[in-house]
Amino acid sequence: MELLFLGTGSGVPSKGRNVSAVALQLLEERGATWLFDCGEATQHQILHTSIRPRRIERIFITHLHGDHIFGLPGLLGSRSFQGGETPLFVYGPAGIRSFVETALAVSGTRLKYELYIEEFTEGVIFEDEQFIVTAKLLDHGLPSYGFRIVEKDLPGTLLVDELRALGVKPGPIYQQIKRGEVVTLDDGTVIDGRKFVAPPKKGRMIAIMGDTRYCEASVELAEGVDVLVHEATFSANEAHLARDYYHSTTVQAAEVAKRARAKQLILTHISSRYQGEMCDQLVEEAKTIFPNVALASDFSSFSIIRKGHDER
């Protein structure tokens, strides 16, 4: 599981940063990539990475400002032109369906794969046997959402060495034991399967925020996550601009991470006014509140390692 930032700027593209898009690489988990937002030229950014468009399985849109959606129609078309045939799911606030369908229709773009567009409000917007994704409304003037992505706990591994020490040979009985069943061996020995399975492996948790002012919904979404991705459009001394334009400062993002007890904070959506050493200053501002901070640049990647069952 890896976060790969494709665009980390705010508002409009700049020489150093493209507009918003971040990929959640789930290649080991499900052979797929999920995309969060798709600003202008996202597909061009993808060309500089190992991401294969046909492996993009789901796209989650935080809100309908252009710097978060203008790259979507082009990416959908290119995915088809490049041989993508598997279904693609797009999730977004009300209006995303009209935007996508109109862009594809007016441009005469025909897709070779099934496209499913789901408009959501708050609550669980996706769940399967591996993951659950929850959305909450943030504070950005027009509807902007944050996402909490939770990997479900994995079953514990079978304690094979302990079974072999008891003379239990590999075979179908191992599956029974792994399911926690009580089994009786040929010699009458009773095996309680629950005692021969390691504790479950704790799933990983990520929170990815759309554009927002500091708000309680961000704290709730980020509760206990391994990684919080939060916008930091402005420096701490420009809180008045953050308030007026419905954005956050570095310190406000750090406050969310601290209150939520997140393990790591990654800052993104950085104004082009901050260059070079000024970006280092943004990190230092956040660290006065929350120590484990990184500032994302385009093509930054962050691995999210699964901890042991006793590391919560």
Curated annotation (Swiss-Prot):
Residues annotated as transmembrane: none
Residues binding Zn(2+) 1, per UniProt: 63, 65, 140, 211
**How is the cofactor bound, as the UniProt entry phrases it?**
Binds 2 Zn(2+) ions.
Quote the catalytic activity from the record. Endonucleolytic cleavage of RNA, removing extra 3' nucleotides from tRNA precursor, generating 3' termini of tRNAs. A 3'-hydroxy group is left at the tRNA terminus and a 5'-phosphoryl group is left at the trailer molecule
User: Where do the annotations place Zn(2+) 2 binding?
Assistant: 67-68, 211, 269
The protein's required cofactor(s) are namely: Zn(2+)
- The answer, when asked if Transmembrane is one of the entry's keywords, is no
Does the keyword Manganese feature in the UniProt annotation? no
Q: Which domain of life is it from?
A: Bacteria
Record's subunit section: Homodimer.
Primary role: Zinc phosphodiesterase, which displays some tRNA 3'-processing endonuclease activity. Probably involved in tRNA maturation, by removing a 3'-trailer from precursor tRNA.
Q: What is this protein called?
A: Ribonuclease Z
Which gene is this protein's source? Answer: rnz
